Amino acid sequence: MGKVIGIDLGTTNSAMAVYEGNEAKIIANKEGKNTTPSIVAFTDKGEILVGESAKRQAVTNPEKTIYSIKRIMGLMFNEDKAKEAEKRLPYKIVDRNGACAIEISGKIYTPQEISAKILMKLKEDAESYLGESVTEAVITVPAYFNDSQRKATKEAGTIAGLNVLRIINEPTSAALAYGLDKKESEKIMVYDLGGGTFDVTVLETGDNVVEVLATGGDAFLGGDDFDNRVIDFLAAEFKNETGIEIKNDVMALQRLKEAAENAKKELSSAMETEINLPFITADATGPKHLVKKLTRAKFESLTEDLVEETISKIESVIKDAGLTKNEISEVVMVGGSTRIPKVQERVKAFINKELNKSVNPDEVVAVGASIQGGVLKGDVKDVLLLDVTPLSLGIETLGGVMTKVIDRGTTIPAKKSQVFSTAEDNQPAVSIMVLQGERELARDNKSLGKFDLQGIAPAPRGMPQIEVTFDIDANGILTVSAQDKNTGKSQEIKISGSSGLSDSEIEKMVKDAELHKEEDARKKEVIEARNHADSLAHQTQKSLDEHKTNLNENDANEIQNAINALKDCIKNDNATKAELEDKTKALTQAAQKLGEAMANKNNAEQPKKKDDDVIDAEVE
């Protein structure tokens, strides 16, 4: 087994590191730099440029220069974020089997293929640096990357000729690099604001254990968004002065993007900067120049809501971890965008403690990934990395309820099973709808996928035992299987492609769950009362039909009337929990005489005892 490299495949820049000689080292690229621009360009001569060389020619070749590809990695074409990216990016985004892809000179490329070209460059540079072949890697992703995005990242590694040993979360990787030598237990918060993504994670480190307590973020919030605010401001100012919509000119837009990024960087150390773009465009009156001063105060006002959005996520993640701000002992700042003074100022003010800037924000994630590579190879001993799943996972059960199988915050890898049953007599198949989210009702959560388990042996409802197993691997990739315990027949689905969950949806789910908590609980109580009533009516009717001859006519009619009344109540969509419970209670009391008659019948069959492991929920 050769050396395992750790790769931070970033939106704006990428970095790599290796663990050797009992320490993690950043690997410089062939240009001698510790980071490589995550940019790929296709020239008119048929060349493919990656990194610095691609960045240098971007202004003259904007439509064939691909940057921020991570923003559409694993994204479905019909998602709002894809439409947003389409407006912002100069290259053409197209629909390929429902997923986002790009078109260059009539040829379609997937985000995995473009990312693979970046990874190939990193792989070649690492081989040059190490003097040996590199075939294995640990690659990092934002903590809030969904299953589809994680799989796409792993596929990019495969295309690049790398065996991706592990996909790990960026803030967790940073904590691994920061906390490896910490002997005393510390609760640290990693604030990771990169070029295109934002993550905040609260972890406990110490004694060579790095355990994630809670994580949150937004896979579509980063330095690019800060740049875009400057671009929009400059374009609006230019239009007011000249009447020209500069954003319609892709070459001008590329120049504007570079100028906005440089202005943002300059304002990290200066209070004012001048943006000077001569001959940015032209009209009938002649060439036009863009010259504009931008103060730090104006930049901060343009981006204030973006910074505040990160603060609100910090608050919710600390709450999810079951901690208070005072219990956070260190705040580790990661990602190039944390150099923005206002970001540092707001995080410091919110947490009320000095920020830890001892780590290089551009390199620490790759360093942590290389340490994880060392762990997997056996070079790093006794280090335990415990990550978590960001949202609950479950299936839809009778009445449209979301029944959770794996709870949010469960340490991964994880494998959990529950036993369900059928909703109808002699039901030949069950449909398993896999869900992700925090709401009580299935329709309010994200559907990840659906599959059918066929060939269930004929049996009364509630008798078949269908074991549903959720298996999340160490990369956070989910497989769901279902098995009929009586026949042994099974079916499984590996969640992928269109089943991915966008990060904006995740955030909305968490917020909606909080807002609708009481309402959802009431709805669930009504559904559970209806399910219980339906089960009682069904079972009592079956028993009455079988033992009616052992009852006098008045008792039999009383029980039948109670069954009918309960069935009418069940059919009424507006029936309340109290009404359902009253009718259920009435039938229970009426059916006591039926129970006595059955007990008195010497040859009455004893009902089969319900399996203790069977969950009181049914699959439609």
Curated annotation (Swiss-Prot):
A GO MF term: ATP-dependent protein folding chaperone
Signal peptide per UniProt: none
UniProt keywords, alphabetically: ATP-binding, Chaperone, Nucleotide-binding, Phosphoprotein, Stress response
Region (Disordered): 593-620
Record Gene3D superfamilies: 1.20.1270.10, 3.30.420.40, Actin, Chain A, domain 4, Substrate Binding Domain Of DNAk, Chain A, domain 1
Residues with PTM Phosphothreonine: 197
InterPro entries membership: ATPase_NBD, Chaperone_DnaK, Heat_shock_70_CS, HSP70_C_sf, HSP70_peptide-bd_sf, Hsp_70_fam
CDD domains: ASKHA_NBD_HSP70_DnaK-like
Inducers of expression: By stress conditions e.g. heat shock.
Function statement: Acts as a chaperone.
Family from the record: Belongs to the heat shock protein 70 family.
NCBIfam families: PRK00290.1, PRK05183.1, prok_dnaK
Record-given protein name: Chaperone protein DnaK
Protein species of origin: Helicobacter pylori (strain J99 / ATCC 700824) (Campylobacter pylori J99)
Lineage per the UniProt record: Bacteria, Pseudomonadati, Campylobacterota, Epsilonproteobacteria, Campylobacterales
Originating gene: dnaK
